[in-house]
Amino acid sequence: MTIGRREFLKTGAAAAAAAWVGGPAVLSAQGKGKVRLAYLQLGWAATEIIHKEDLLGKRGWAAEYSIVPGAPGPLLNQLASKNVDAIDMSFALAAKAFEDGVPLKVTGVATAVLGAIVARKDAGLGKVEDLKGRKIAAIVGTSTFFDIRALTLKGYGFDLQKDTQIVTATSPPDMVTLLGKKEVDAIIAWQPITDSVVFRGEGVYLVKQIDLWRKATGRASGFPVHVCYLVHNEFLQKNPQIAGDLNEAQKDAVDIWYNKPARAMEIVAEVTKLPKDVIQVAHKETVRMLHGLADEQVETLIAQLKINKEFGFLKSDIWDNPDRIRREFFHRA
């Protein structure tokens, strides 16, 4: 499986990637039964607000929440093996897992794309085309790099992998170091890594993934999705109400994110352990927190899948058939 951008966010030892922070928090029994929701520590999807405000418990569930540090792989494995019932996940990796036979459904969305190209402040880069021939640090296996490369190729007609000098990095801190030492002119990364570089004054946003998307697709509205919610098919069949309740919980979390930002950032700091000043910048720079699975959102998601298939990230024939995608990949409450 191609590695997603969140595999490379702040992690401990490899073993810690599969560990669960502090174990699951089991809450008092509720009328609808138990649901186990696990999420990535640095997911940037407002799931931590659902957890800390127990927004599923408030909808009648005995909710068990687990925070998973590091890579998305172990989190997907937890869902596939039915150790948890629902997770947040990169949309591209969700599609890849579906191709690979994981019995899951996308029930809702959580956050728009988080990627960006950040230029070194004194590199003399003013527009995307200026990247030609320049040195760019990137983690080539990530879905963010793949998406930004595909969108640049589609929107600007040049290939970041062939028309620039890609310096392969192993982690976000590696990219930050390369930029700081002036060994590269730009980095291709994602929130909150990009925000921390800009906050420290080492880089400036050259272009955000959302703007590349708008240029490449001609879509002036709608938000391409980075993070979505997945529910295991078996649990969903037995408990179909979880889809709507999870979307409603996310809606409340998004409301807190925008209307009670101090509380939202307090929760994010508690879960992510990131510095508060970085969280403040990242909160401000976040493209859009999302919820639900409205018609317009589904159309945007189908367009994302088409691009991922067109440029080789996805392989299955299902992504050429919007009706099959709606029927087999999505579950709309």
Residue ranges and their predicted role:
Residues A92-L93, D174-T177, K181-I267:
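Pocket-lining segment of extracytoplasmic ligand-binding domains
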Residues M1-A16:
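N-terminal secretory signal peptides and thylakoid transit peptides that target proteins
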Residues K58-R59, I210-G222, R288-Q297:
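Short, solvent-exposed loop/beta-turn-alpha elements that line the ligand-binding surface or hinge
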Residues A25-A29:
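Sec/Tat signal peptide C-region and signal peptidase I cleavage site
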Residues K306-A333:
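Conserved C-terminal helix/tail region of periplasmic/extracytoplasmic solute-binding proteins
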Residues Q30-A169, D185-Q191, E202, V207:
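Short, glycine-/small- and polar/acidic-enriched structural segments
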Residues Q237-F313:
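Secondary-structure end/capping motifs
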Residues V68, P72, G141-F145, P172, ...:
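Solvent-exposed, acidic/flexible segments
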